[in-house]
């Protein structure tokens, strides 16, 4: 960046809370913030002093709904890609799966097979598989894994801060992994009885930054798009909505 831009145009500042506070006291023309809700509120509070326009991208638990008409192999391949990209450390990663109860086992098996295909039998040894950003986050993620519900993965290596692609089923909203945005390579699978139940579940929680829906039913697709509130998303894919510059990017409510 320094080779291309003078400091007065583009500057990168790294640091912690002290640096954040110093930046927030500057009189910027525009602030675009990516982070969590707590700091997002602080950004808005400081920006109000100068009436500075703000765009917030605050993440959240982005659902991936899969109904009984979905093409299971396709869904598994694209969910695994979207979830484990950068070890799940992306703001728009599918946070959890909400699938039709009738296809749970079939979808779970397909996801397990796809994880092995994409990352090998020993992903912790795969040089192309990433690591967790720091030790604090690594330990936090380990605390979200319930070994009794793991169907693949769960292994970790503290020396290199790696956690294998992990899938958990028989998960409920009372589990620790559902209490906050995961931001890591852990994929909980929950089920629903009807699509209306799934929509009600999504809408009963803070609006997510992204939503993904796998279905071949056009009416079902329209229902989800009409009734669910979210920032951006895809039908029969994940993540790829970021690839177009023709769409805006942001969340709704707590997600930005």
Predicted regions and their residues:
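PLP-dependent aminotransferase-like
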Residues: 1-18
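Short hydrophobic/charged patches on amphipathic alpha-helices used for structural packing
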Residues: 20-21, 76, 199, 222
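Short loop/turn motifs at secondary-structure junctions
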Residues: 6, 27, 50, 93, ...
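Conserved C-terminal structural/oligomerization subdomain of aldehyde/semialdehyde dehydrogenase
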Residues: 28, 65, 116, 162-256
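ALDH superfamily catalytic-core signature
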Residues: 29-30, 36-173, 195-196, 200, ...
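Beta-loop-alpha module in the N-terminal Rossmann-like domain of NAD(P)-dependent dehydrogenases
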Residues: 14-22, 26-27, 35-42
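Generic structural signal for residues in well-ordered beta-strands
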Residues: 10-12, 54, 150, 189
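Short amphipathic alpha-helical segments
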Residues: 24-25, 43-46, 109-110, 225-226, ...
């Amino acid at each position: 960046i320094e080779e291309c831009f003078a400091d007065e145009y583009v500057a990168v500042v790294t640091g912690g809370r002290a640096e954040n506070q110093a930046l927030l006291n500057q009189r910027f023309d525009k602030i675009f913030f990516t982070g969590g809700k707590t700091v997002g509120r602080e950004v808005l509070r400081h920006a109000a002093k100068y009436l500075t326009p703000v765009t917030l991208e605050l993440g959240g638990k982005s659902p991936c709904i899969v109904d009984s008409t979905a093409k299971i192999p396709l869904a598994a391949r694209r969910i695994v890609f979207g979830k484990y990209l950068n070890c799940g450390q992306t703001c728009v990663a599918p946070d959890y799966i909400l699938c039709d109860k009738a296809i749970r086992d079939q979808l779970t098996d397909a996801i397990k097979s796809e994880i092995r295909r994409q990352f090998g039998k020993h992903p912790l040894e795969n040089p192309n598989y990433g690591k967790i950003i720091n030790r604090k986050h690594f330990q936090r993620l380990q605390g979200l894994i319930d070994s009794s519900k793991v169907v693949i993965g769960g292994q970790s290596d503290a020396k290199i801060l790696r956690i294998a692609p992990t899938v958990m089923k028989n998960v409920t909203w009372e589990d620790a992994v559902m209490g906050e945005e995961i931001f890591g390579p852990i994929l909980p699978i929950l089920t629903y009885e009807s699509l209306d139940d799934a929509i009600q579940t999504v809408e009963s929680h803070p609006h997510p930054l992204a939503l993904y829906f796998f279905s071949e039913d056009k009416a079902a697709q329209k229902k989800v798009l009409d009734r669910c509130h979210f920032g951006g998303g895809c039908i029969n894919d994940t993540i790829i909505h970021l690839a177009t510059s023709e769409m805006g990017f942001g969340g709704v409510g707590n997600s930005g």
